[in-house]
């Protein structure tokens, strides 16, 4: 490998890039260049295009990292990102062509998120159709980040960024992971994406798996050392 890659961190639903703060600090302490753009959360094709366009500002090789819905976005974006060399999924969706974030979960027991997310009473701005989705504030801690202290989860709950419902049912048109090495942080106590669903997606990618047995959907926030370590492995072995 030539020049050191830049790591692009793509957040998922009900969150923003600030969730990566400690991961960023860990990576920067190892002299890794990092970027953490906003994911619009409007629809899979739209969001992937936004991330792909953002990467045109970066010179040299790129490692794309996605959490949750952000995993679907990086896999959709990867084929049109110049010089992407690896994908890292943090408790994330890794879709095949023709799958959606909703359909990939159908063979598995419903997650807690299925009963704690609620639609907005308005159409999602900038989305093709349907409402935005939020997690009920009272249920956010248990659903999204049960391994974080309540005082940390509370501001996350009230500042969550909604995901358009359309984004969950929009089908992937490509599977970027099929042509790239992949790493996967698997959260064993995830209440948003069933751990068995994560195992299935990681297994078919033949990803290098880092299990966090007690990890919530936000395990990368609770254990930034593990998340950053996985990203560093992707950098060093690609």
Range-by-range predicted roles:
Residues 2-60:
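Active-site catalytic motif of lipid deacylating hydrolases and related acyltransferases
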Residues 5, 177-182, 205-208:
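Short, proline-enriched alpha-helix->beta-strand connector loops that line the catalytic pocket
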Residues 83-128, 164-167, 201:
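Flexible "cap/lid" loop of the alpha/beta hydrolase fold
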Residues 155-176:
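Active-site nucleophile elbow and catalytic-triad environment of alpha/beta-hydrolase enzymes
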Residues 184-186:
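Short beta-strand/loop motif that positions the catalytic acidic residue
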Residues 188-221, 233-234:
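Conserved loop-alpha-helix segment in the C-terminal half of the alpha/beta-hydrolase fold
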